[in-house]
Regions:
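Beta-strand/loop substructures that line and gate deep hydrophobic ligand-binding cavities in soluble
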Residues: 80-127
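Hydrophobic ligand-binding cavity/cleft-lining segments
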Residues: 1-43, 51, 168, 174-189
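Intrinsic-disorder/low-complexity, polar/charged segments enriched in Ser/Thr/Lys/Arg/Asp/Glu/Gln
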Residues: 2-6, 43, 58-60, 73, ...
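Hydrophobic pocket/interface hotspot
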Residues: 16-20, 26, 65, 107, ...
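Hydrophobic/aromatic beta-strand elements that line small-molecule binding cavities or substrate pockets
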Residues: 5, 34, 61-67, 90-98
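Short, Lys/Arg-rich cytosolic juxtamembrane segment immediately N-terminal
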Residues: 162-169
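A conserved amphipathic terminal alpha-helix motif
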Residues: 116-156
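Glycine-rich portal/gate segments that line the openings of hydrophobic small-molecule binding cavities
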Residues: 38-79
Length: 189
């Protein structure tokens, strides 16, 4: 399965990169996320609880970042397991392009899924994937507005999510994580 998309962000490219590399920001923004931890250089583990139609499951996953070109692009390799509910693996190419209004996030996800969730109807899976993606970006927009207010975009505002970042994880990785979760759901048909 392949999924592509773009999203206009209200923050500058570097600010988006920084926010996407902040595990606390990502934890707040990814629906159902209860854990994001560094497990090596440019490697992370995460836990997410999701409900897709009649199927509820806790997914554990690994993310590895490659082809990093800060603050412009990277490739995210992922795999996730939800027990009998299903599994998913794949890659996501992510780009942050500067625009006059802030920056544009572009992504292309290639994923494979299987298990019980793969047996659900395509329309249900598509709807959940779209809903998760929209919820992530809604939360991300709100969080970046708190961190980088329009009236003073040079000085971040202190908030619980603006604590020191874990080394090696750009903020866009978390956005990609949300896209990956949505892609996993989308491909589990």
């Amino acid at each position: 399965m392949e999924m592509q998309g773009t999203r206009q962000l209200k923050v500058q490219q570097q600010q988006a990169w920084d926010a996407l590399n902040n595990p606390e920001v990502l934890k707040v923004c990814i629906p159902g996320c209860d854990r994001i931890e560094a497990s090596g250089e440019n490697e992370f583990s995460m836990g997410t609880a999701l409900k897709i139609g009649p199927v509820s499951a806790k997914f554990s996953g690994k993310i590895m970042l490659t082809d990093m070109n800060p603050p412009a692009s990277y490739t995210l390799n992922f795999e996730g397991q939800g027990g009998v509910a299903g599994f998913g693996k794949g890659t996501a190419a992510v780009e942050l392009m500067p625009t006059p209004e802030g920056c544009e996030l572009r992504y292309t996800v290639n994923a494979q899924v299987g298990g019980k969730i793969a047996q659900l109807g395509q329309r249900l899976i598509d709807g959940v994937a779209k809903s998760l993606s929209e919820e992530f970006f809604k939360r991300f927009d709100a969080e970046t507005e708190r961190l980088y207010p329009v009236q003073d975009s040079a000085a971040p505002v202190e908030s619980p999510a603006s604590q020191p970042q874990a080394q090696g994880w750009p903020n866009w990785v978390w956005v990609v994580g949300a896209v990956v979760v949505a892609a996993l759901i989308y491909t589990m048909r």
